[in-house]
Every structure is written in structure tokens, then in C-alpha cells.
Design a protein with these regions (language model features):
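Interdomain "pre-motor" coupling segment immediately N-terminal to P-loop NTPase/helicase cores
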Residues: 1-23
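P-loop NTPase catalytic phosphate-binding loop
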Residues: 19-195, 199, 205-207
Length: 208
């Protein structure tokens, strides 16, 4: 699909959400080559994800009961150091605090939303018809994010996911339950790949 002709423009986040400029394109080629490993599937095939593939990824895991996801941290760092995409983080459990303003980071996410008001504001901005720069939306617990939104916000979130490519947006999210019945219509189906851990704790990789 061809990219929209609208020139990229940075749109501000809500004042309550930390805002920092994105890094320049000096590490663009490195970011495109970097792959994030997820172990092996049930057939022994290595499972990985990379930024340049442009595929929306959903990881089945419980953010409330698990330690912070190393894979999410790697995806965030790859995005931050690559210079090809801005990073927007929705983190309702505040599991990835280092993204919220670590002084040691040379740059940080465009937005780090943790409260219901902040999440609502981020979703509203992403649903805007104005096309911004390429972005990665990293959601640490999709179910909790949906629960934080009202009906209008949930409808907007589903629309953001369905129309993501038209807005140069790449989705990466975790959730404890991938059953579409618990989510706004079209939200789960918008993800291309789903990584799920079965009882034997071996990752499986589903292509959508």
C-alpha cells in the first residue's frame, strides 16, 4: 500500500504525558535488520519479529502476573535507537517504567500513557485523520487498555488498529486473553501474528 502524501508532522501528546523528540535516522539500517527472538515454536522453528516486516504482533501473556516482558523492552529499544519510527507506549500497569523518563536514555517514547485519561488522549490522537510520522504503538496489556476506555474510546481503538497501515502505525501488544469476544469488533483480527504460550510454556506462533 502506498504511503499517504500528507507530509509528516509531529502532533503533541496530552500535557500530562511525557514528550520527547524522536532520534534522528543515523541508525536506520541497524533498526531494519534487528530481529527480536521469541524462542522456538512447537515444531522447533525459531520465532522472531522485526520492525521492517511491518506486521502487527500480539503476544499472549499476563502483564499483572508476569515479570516485565524482555521482548517488549527489546522492541521498544529497537524502535528508540532506529530513528525510523516514533514510539507510543500504553502501559496501564506501569511495568516498563524505564520508558517513562529515564535520564540515562538518549531519547524516549513520544508518549508514555499509564492513566485512563492519558490512554484516552493517546487513542484520540491516533484516531486523528492527520497522518503523522511512522510510529510503533506498544501496548503492555491490551485487555487493561480496553477496560480503561469508555465505549467511544474502544470504538476508536478498534478503528486505529484496523486502519493502522493507512496511518503508518505498527502495533505490538500483550494480553492475557486473545479471544475476540472480549474486545471491540475487529481489534484482535487486526493483528497479523499472535505469539502464545501453551501450558508447556513453549511459544507458538500463529500467522493471520
Amino acid at each position: 500500500m502506498s504511503m499517504p502524501a500528507t507530509p509528516p508532522t509531529r502532533r503533541p501528546c496530552r500535557p500530562s504525558v511525557p514528550v520527547r523528540p524522536a532520534r534522528g535516522p543515523s541508525a536506520r539500517a541497524v533498526a531494519c535488520r534487528t530481529t527480536i527472538p521469541f524462542g522456538r515454536d512447537n515444531d522447533g522453528t525459531p520465532v522472531s519479529w522485526d520492525l521492517s516486516a511491518g506486521r502487527h504482533l500480539l503476544i499472549r501473556r499476563d502483564e499483572r502476573r508476569s515479570s516485565p516482558s524482555v521482548s517488549l523492552d527489546l522492541i521498544a529499544m529497537t524502535t528508540l535507537t532506529g530513528g525510523t519510527h516514533d514510539l507510543v507506549v500504553v502501559d496501564p500497569h506501569r511495568r516498563h517504567r524505564w520508558l517513562g523518563g529515564s535520564a540515562s536514555l538518549p531519547t524516549g517514547p513520544c508518549c508514555w500513557a499509564t492513566t485512563a485519561d492519558q490512554i484516552t488522549g493517546v487513542v484520540a490522537e491516533l484516531d486523528s485523520p492527520v497522518v503523522g510520522p511512522p510510529r510503533v504503538l506498544l501496548v503492555a496489556d491490551l485487555a487493561a487498555t480496553v477496560a480503561a476506555l469508555d465505549d467511544e474510546g474502544r470504538t476508536r481503538l478498534a478503528r486505529v488498529a484496523v486502519d493502522a497501515r493507512e496511518h503508518q502505525l505498527l502495533l505490538v501488544a500483550t494480553t492475557a486473553d486473545t479471544n475476540p469476544r472480549w474486545y471491540p469488533e475487529g481489534l484482535i483480527d487486526a493483528f497479523d501474528d499472535i505469539v502464545a504460550r501453551r501450558r508447556e510454556e513453549r511459544p507458538s506462533f500463529g500467522l493471520r
